[in-house]
Amino acid sequence: MPTINQLIRNTRQSIRNVKKSPALQGCPQRRGICTRVYTINPKKPNSATRKVARVRLTSGFEITAYIPGIGHNSQEHSSVLVRGGRVPDLPGVKYHIVRGTLDAVGVKDRQQGRSKYGVKKPKKKK
């Protein structure tokens, strides 16, 4: 417990909340250009090859973003839209690429959860 003199000398520091996606600078999404598209392996106990892209944002930040869904057409110099949201088993990946916008096409033959993967409602067959 500090004395009154100690409190006068230096006041209590308020706890600052840490932003989870600082590269977006308060925006819901940001546009960027892919500088590298590659795969990485997740942490234990998971096993896979997750597709990620290194993206240079319009805000000037260089970030690593996850490419969700099965199959993608993203390559170097692709223009992509990036949203926040981390991938729990990939260290350092705090952003997702939005499918179905700009150069990132939606997931092919997706029937359920289509809005998250940029897929239009399929035509009904008679």
Swiss-Prot record:
GO terms for biological process: translation. SUPFAM superfamilies: Nucleic acid-binding proteins. PANTHER family: 30S RIBOSOMAL PROTEIN S12 FAMILY MEMBER. Pfam families: Ribosom_S12_S23. It comes from the Eukaryota. GO terms for cellular component: chloroplast; small ribosomal subunit. The gene is rps12-A. This is Small ribosomal subunit protein uS12cz/uS12cy. It comes from Jasminum nudiflorum (Winter jasmine). Its main location: plastid. Part of the 30S ribosomal subunit. Residues 117-126 have a biased composition (Basic residues).
